[in-house]
Amino acid sequence: MLVPLTDASARTCGGKAGALGDLLRAGLPVPDGWAVPLDVYRSAVRDASSASETRRNGPAAIADRPVPADVRAALADAVATLGGAPVVVRSSASDEDAHDGAAAGLYTSTLAVRGVDAVVASVRACWVSLHADPAVAYRAARRRDADPAMGVVVQRHVDADVSGVMFTPARPDGPTRIDASWGLGPSVVEGAVNPDAYTVGADGSVDAVTAEKRTRLDRRGDRLVTRVVPAPDRHRRVLDDTDARRLADLGRVVGAALGGAQDVEWAIADGQVWILQARPVTADLPPATPPSPTVRPAAGATVLTGAPGSRGTATGPARVVRDPGDFVHVRRGDVLVCPWTDPGWTPLLRVVGGVVTETGGVLSHAAIVARELGIPAVLGVPDATLLLGDASLVTVDGSAGTVTRAVG
């Protein structure tokens, strides 16, 4: 019924589980766990409704149906072997973490899950997310499989002191790019903080850009809590040069094991580095050292700077979006300006001409999706929602990391 992660493959258990299985078989540090195979989802959906009904009714076709008793029993046995320790329940769709599209952040993953009832509910949430609006919109934009299946990964939870994302090099002499912050990884991958950014050269050189990390995410029992980072730690590097090189070295091994440049989520807990997931890099990053802006601003124009997240330029009316209630105001060609983006906002990326956020790094989920869709993005622009203003004419240069507000 369940497959140990050491035996998981992408064909039977989805992209995320398959990659973790490959890494475990290569002897790399991956938290132990199990996969709920794709066929379990297919069987559960087939028993609950027809495939056409599932596509037509979306999440509602699955959300209220009980998880089959044999699946629940297998999950209960697996959780019992951990002695009550918390787990993380991650999506592992058949179209996820692939070479032609990552579907980054679109499907549900739940941290700090404790007890069989919560695990079962989290597995169902993964299944439901396969048919949620953001995932459907992404598949349409990328012309992906219209009828994918959902595997699920259940792993031991890692209480990270430091975590982040790493892009391994595409060639032997290329650099490794690392974003890192305090606490659990969602702060970085969801763009909720401005992370430290590290570039580790093939020769071991380390270039570090330290950000102000105001908050961190931690586990408290079976809940996640956001805490304020103490003032002395906000501008302190979360990785020293030795840690950055250690991650880069591990990243090169991951790339060799999986074949090609990888987008790796990692964590450090009590000095131990863990690989939480890995997937192919699906679109090139802008250069670590941005070029000069491609458009010279007019006299008197306001120029803001941030991290270049996705190449290209776009000009259009700024549209400030602070929550889903603002979606109705967005028009095709607008420049989305927001505190940060949520995976649930992916449908907007099919409409807007560019993206500007106040927080987030170039390795966050929003930046990955913007690069895949070819939308210019500049991230981590302080007070962008206040300084740009709704309906002002702005130009986004996602290669140079600049946002220019026109005069007037």
Outline where the language-model segments fall.
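N-terminal beta-alpha lobe that positions the nucleotide/phosphoryl donor
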Residues: 1-153, 160-162, 242, 255, ...
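Conserved metal-phosphate-binding beta-hairpin within the catalytic cores
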Residues: 105, 256-284
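Short beta-strand elements
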Residues: 108, 156, 165-184, 278-283
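Hydrophobic "anchor" residues
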Residues: 175-176, 206, 273, 403
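Conserved catalytic alpha/beta cores of large enzymes that bind or transform nucleotide phosphates
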Residues: 180-261
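A short, polar/charged loop-to-alpha-helix boundary motif
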Residues: 187-190, 282-293
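Acidic, glycine-rich flexible loop/linker segments
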Residues: 280-285, 313-334, 339-408
